[in-house]
Structures are given as C-alpha cells and as structure tokens.
C-alpha cells in the first residue's frame, strides 16, 4: 500500500495481484472509452511504480509475491512472474499517459528495459523455453507480449508439447489458468486447449464438476480435510472468458 505519507512494505501478495490497479482501468477504457478511472488512479499508480523501483534487486528484477498461486505440481519462479507483471504495469502506465495527456516516456523506457531483462535472464533461445519450463511461464510470456516475435510460435509449440507430455492435463495455478488456454488457441492449438478444458481427470475444471461442485474452488485438488481455502472462488475461472 502506497500512501501520501507512509509506505507499508509488502512481503507476500506482490505485484501480480497489485497489477489490478493497471489492468482494471485499462479494461474499463477498452470497454467504454472512459478514461476517468485512469485519471483518478494516476497518482496512486505513479507512487506504486516508484515503490516497485525501490524493491528491485541488483539485476532489476522484483522477487517477492505469490506468483502463480495454487499451482498443481510445478511452481513457476516468482521472480519471473513478478517481473513480467512489473513490465506490464509500466507498459500500461505509458499508455495511460498517452490517453490522459501526461508524459509517459519514462514508463515506456522502463517497460522496454524490463522486457530486455526478462528475455536475457529467463529465456533460453536455444530451446525457446522460459524460466523453468513450466506451462505457466510459457503462457505468461506469450500473453504479455514478452516473447520476441521470431520465437512466438516456437514457444507456443513447446507449450503444446509440455501439455501433451502431461497427458493433456494442466500443471499451473491462477496465472496459467488465465493464459495457457488463450495462447494455445491463438497459436494454432485450439483443439488441444479444448481437450485440456474438457478433462475430467484431476487436476481440471471438469473434475470439480465430476465431484458435484457447482461453484469454482480456490485450488485444484480437494479433500475431506479441505479447510483453508474457499469453495466459491472465481479466480481460476478465466476458462469462461476463453470459451467466448
């Protein structure tokens, strides 16, 4: 939380969640052409990005946060997902500036620097694989436009290969649930995306239905000892938007 006179240092949730302050006003603008939310949030966004700049490590990455929350087996490195959304924040801030008549050159420059950093540190060009090779890492990099144009299809091809090797089962958390189906569809693997979406074997959306759930759970695997998470939680529900 960034206030006018104090700063509470976040050590848990992190920039992926905080990115809502950029994503929501951008969505409002795209749907309605209305910039009032951008104008209202501009001072907060300015302070927040200054705060994140102060949380960078020596390389320029931001390492805290919960990242691909409720992943199944493979955890995508938090420093990767956090820095990717730090890039998105700056990219959107530059666009906000353009829309409301502010100077966004520093944010555009920062976004480009972060994109270069992410690709230098986390992208293996010889294999066309991001980070630790997780499904979510490939989905996030493609969805946010971080992948160099000449490698986009290769990264998507590798994503499809990972999923097929995992019996068309998902292996991600909230960030993968937002990005993987969309990117499979975008790059020629809509049939594979559908097979993943229609799975009834756990972990899957279909497995919840098979078990009789009529609401979305907070985590993929449920048990009789399920006590610490919600069974009416929308954040793994982007599959609905993907369908339409």
Where are these regions (language model features)?
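Short, small-residue-biased leader/transition segments that mark boundaries at the very start
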Residues: 1-8
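Short linear capping/connector segments at secondary-structure termini
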Residues: 4, 65-71, 126
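Extended, well-ordered alpha-helical scaffold segments
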Residues: 4, 35-52, 93, 99-121, ...
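The substrate-binding groove and active-site-proximal loops of carbohydrate-active enzymes
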Residues: 9-14, 29-39, 70-82, 100
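C-terminal capping/lid segments that line or modulate ligand- or cofactor-binding pockets
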Residues: 21-22, 28, 76-78, 82, ...
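Heptad-repeat amphipathic alpha-helical coiled-coil interaction surface used
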Residues: 29, 87, 93-94, 111
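Internal glycine-rich alpha/beta core junctions
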Residues: 50-53, 58-59, 144-147
């Amino acid at each position: 939380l960034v206030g006018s006179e104090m700063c509470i240092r976040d050590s848990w949730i992190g920039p992926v969640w905080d990115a809502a302050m950029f994503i929501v006003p951008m969505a409002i603008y795209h749907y309605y052409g209305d910039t009032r939310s951008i104008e209202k949030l501009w001072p907060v966004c300015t302070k927040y990005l200054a705060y994140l700049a102060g949380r960078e490590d020596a390389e320029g990455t931001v390492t805290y946060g919960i990242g691909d929350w409720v992943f199944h087996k493979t955890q995508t490195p938090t420093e990767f997902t956090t820095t990717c959304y730090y890039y998105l924040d700056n990219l959107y801030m530059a666009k906000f500036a353009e829309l409301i008549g502010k100077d966004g050159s520093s944010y555009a420059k920062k976004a480009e620097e972060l994109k270069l950093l992410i690709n230098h540190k986390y992208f293996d060009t010889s294999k066309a694989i991001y980070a630790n090779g997780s499904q979510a890492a490939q989905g996030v990099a493609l969805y946010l436009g971080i992948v160099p144009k000449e490698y986009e299809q290769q990264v998507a091809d590798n994503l499809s290969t990972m999923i097929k090797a995992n019996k068309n089962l998902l292996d991600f958390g909230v960030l993968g649930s937002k990005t993987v189906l969309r990117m499979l569809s975008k790059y020629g693997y809509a049939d594979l995306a559908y097979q993943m979406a229609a799975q009834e074997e756990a972990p899957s959306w279909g497995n919840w239905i098979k078990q009789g759930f009529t609401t979305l759970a907070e985590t993929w695997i449920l048990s009789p000892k399920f006590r610490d998470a919600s069974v009416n939680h929308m954040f793994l529900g982007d599959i609905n938007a993907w369908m339409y």
